[in-house]
Each structure stands twice: as structure tokens, then as C-alpha cells.
Amino acid sequence: MIKLYQFDELRPEEILNRDIRAEKNVEDVVDGILADVRARGDAALKEYALKFDGASIEELQVTQAEIDEAFANMDPYFLETLKEAAANIEAFHRQQVHKNFVMNDKPGVVLGQKYTPIEKAGVYVPGGTAAYPSTVLMDVIPAKVAGVSEIVMTTPAGKDGRVNPVILAAAATAGVTKIFKTGGAQAVAALAYGTESIPAVDKIVGPGNIYVATAKRKVFGKVGIDMIAGPSEILVLADGGCDPAWVAADLLSQAEHDKLASPVLVTDSEALAKAVQAELEVQIPQLPRAAIARASVDDNGKIIVCTDLHKAIEACNIIAPEHLEVCVEDPFGVLNEIKNAGSIFLGRNVPEALGDYFAGPNHTLPTSGTARFSSPLGVDDFVKKSSFLYYTRDALEVVAPRIADFAEREGLHAHARSVTIRYE
């Protein structure tokens, strides 16, 4: 059963409860895979596909015929859903596009900043027991909107050597350039270093298991990465007017993801807390993934009862959750009090699943408290900004003495000389 706590009796570390430890051998395993793929390229990828996925792969790249077949056999209703979701995601992310700017308010001086998309992006899409076409849309479309010219996707093949057709349909809908049949840390290595088939990219995005996350951390610096994603989190901030069955269902929407997922309710109502506690016991046995949800709720879930709504918001800001549902009477009235959250779902009719699949804001979000200093995946992740400056000879001459003086005070006389030599 989910545990119930009083906020005023908890220490900060008890509120957070993120003591997730990786297996001791993960680092060594990932180091070996990275080195192997870097040395042997495609051959190593094919061996790992057989070893980890049971897939015998002849050609790593997905063919156009495979993509066409996926579309031909896809449920038309779901294809329309994909297209509508993609349109929503694109419309939202187009609002994130920055404009270059120029300043020329001083005689002979032009200053500015310009945005340039990265050239190649790598998108990792998990495989395993479930297919995640939503991840494809969320990770690819911002890159497309940003203007990335080459978007390379990797995802594990099934035992039949084929990629799930739902993933292929989503990739084609989103605008992926190339798709390759490889997963795990080996896919991250291929995207970072390149192989005979897979081009090295400039940045890798997308969620994965502990091996994928560790590999991304290790190749950072050779390439950019979006974030190191931990287990999924949901925090429901609810007042006494909420339906406990709805709250329980929302908590379980994340609990079914992973045994390490963290479902949390923060409320100013003791009655709601106890009702949700009971409702979870009713709903968990009804789920197809009941064992996973049970482990998540019992081991990582909690209900925190606060004396008032402002204290409840304080708890939310300490936790800095990935997903924050604000299920209160006036959600917009408290929005500005919320400082730390990956994505904020306002009102009682906005379940987290709406954002996961359809509304438009990105669902690749900071976890493990990193919403204190980081943001959801977006167009910014796929662009670079460069400043530029231009001075005429006369404009430089006006400020040259000050520049030279500044440089000499730092003991950098060559800096000073690079200015003064122009006027000798």
C-alpha cells in the first residue's frame, strides 16, 4: 500500500526519495560496448542485436519497402491519430523558434546573435516490451522544426529482424531521414562515433534504460545529449474537491511504466489522501501491468498531506517533478507559485496522458529533480546561437585605449597589442 506522510514531519531528503542505484557492473559493461562499437562498427552492432535482442540483422538500415509496408498495414484510424498528434506537436514547437537580432545603436558598431540548427541529430527510441511511437514524434518533430538537415533514428529490431511497424509509421510521419536497427548502449556508440552504415551525429536525444543513459553520459563531450533521464515521475497536487478515483488513475498512469517510477500525491486534504490510498488498492489489480504498478506504488509512491495549499506547492517545488498535475479549484491562480516542474497540467480535466500523446508540449522531460535547472526537450535543443560583432576602424579607435588598459590589467599584453598595433 502507498505510504502516507505529514509534510511538516518530513526531512527534505525524505520528501525527495530518489535513492536509485545502478547495478555495479553497468559502467564496465557500457565501457566495453562503446569501445567495441568504436573499433568494429557494424559487425559489433549485428552481434549485439543477436545477443541482446535475439535478432539476426543483415542490413542495419530500414528500407523504404519496410516503411511502405508498415503504412500499408497500419490501422487507418491510428494513422489519422498520428498525423493529428504530429500537427499539434509541430504547432506548439513552432512557437519556440527564436529570431536572430541585430544591434546598431552606436556609430560604426554592429552587434548581433544568430541561430543555426545543428546538422545531424540522433534519436534513440526504446524497444523492449512496448512500442513508443509517441517518443518518435516528441523527439523528432522539434529537430525538424529547428531545421536539422539529417535526423538519424535508432531502435532495436524484434526477433524477426524487423522494426515495429508502428514505430516506422511514426518515424515517417515525423520526418526521420534514416532509421537503423540497433538499440541499447551500442546504438548510442554508433551515433556518437559512426560506423560503416550509421553516420556520426552532433547530438543524441531520447530516453532509454540504465545502459542507454550511462552510454549517453559517457559520450557527452564527443556529442551533445539532451539529458540523463531517470525513472518516470508524476506528482498530483490535489485539493479536497477532487475525485479520488481520478487521482488514483492518474498516479497509476505513470506507475505502470516501471517498477522504479515515482507516483506522488500532495494534498491539503486528509480525507482525499485516505480515499486515494484506498482507491489505489481497488484499481491496481485491474491493470494488465499490475505487478509493475504495485512495485512502483509500494516502493516509490507516497502521499504527502500538507496543512494548506501553499505548503503543498512548497512540497511540489522541493520535489521538482517530471509531470505535475495541478488538480485544484483555481489552477491558474497558483501557476506562478510553481517554480520547479518539467510539464504542468492545469485543472482536473488534464490527465498526464493528454500531454504524453497528443496536446503538443513535449513529453521528454527532466527527471530526478533536475527540473530545478533544466527544461523539456524542444527546439532549443537542436539549435546553436552565435554572437557576431563588427566595428569600423573609427569605432575601434574610440574604445582602443580602454581595451588595451583592460587587457594590461589582466597581464595579457598581446591582447592589448592586437588593438594598439592598428593605430601605430
Residue ranges and their predicted role:
Residues 1-119:
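N-terminal Rossmann-like NAD(P)+-binding subdomain of aldehyde/semialdehyde dehydrogenases
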Residues 103-169:
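Conserved small-residue-rich beta-alpha loop and adjacent elements
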Residues 138-149, 172-174, 192-198, 216-218, ...:
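Alpha-helix C-terminal capping segments
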Residues 149-159, 263-270, 276, 347:
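Short internal beta-strands
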Residues 175-246, 250-253, 257-262:
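Conserved NAD(P)+-binding/catalytic subdomain of aldehyde/semialdehyde dehydrogenases
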Residues 227-299, 303:
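A conserved active-site cap/scaffold subdomain adjacent to cofactor or substrate pockets
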Residues 318-424:
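C-terminal core of ALDH-fold dehydrogenases
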